[in-house]
Design a protein with these regions (language model features):
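Short, charged, intrinsically disordered terminal tails
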Residues: 1-3
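Compact, glycine-rich, soluble single-domain proteins
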Residues: 5-89
Length: 89
């Protein structure tokens, strides 16, 4: 499966930077999943678990982070998550 570059950033630093098959989060409009080559998107994040699904065959299936709200931007096969706070779930 194709991958997309993912950046998970908080005011204290970058918690994740790497390739993923999918990113799942809750926005102001509901739950959404971003795959490779997703159309451009900008939205607000709700406080909710964020899932980063690793490429097939990578160690571990997915990462989960409890995010405390923020923003998500998708463009040029890249997902950038800017959040107030995030901790591994």
């Amino acid at each position: 499966m194709a991958t997309t570059q993912v950046e998970l950033v908080t005011p204290t630093g970058t918690l994740f930077s790497g390739q993923a098959e999918m990113v799942v989060c809750r926005t102001g409009g509901g739950d959404i999943a971003f795959l490779a080559d997703h159309m451009p998107y900008i939205g607000t994040l709700e406080a909710y678990p964020l899932r980063i699904v690793h490429p097939q065959g990578a160690a571990g299936d997915e990462l989960r982070f409890e995010v405390g709200g923020g923003f998500v931007e998708v463009s040029n096969n890249r997902v950038i998550v800017l959040c107030d706070s995030a901790e591994p779930a």
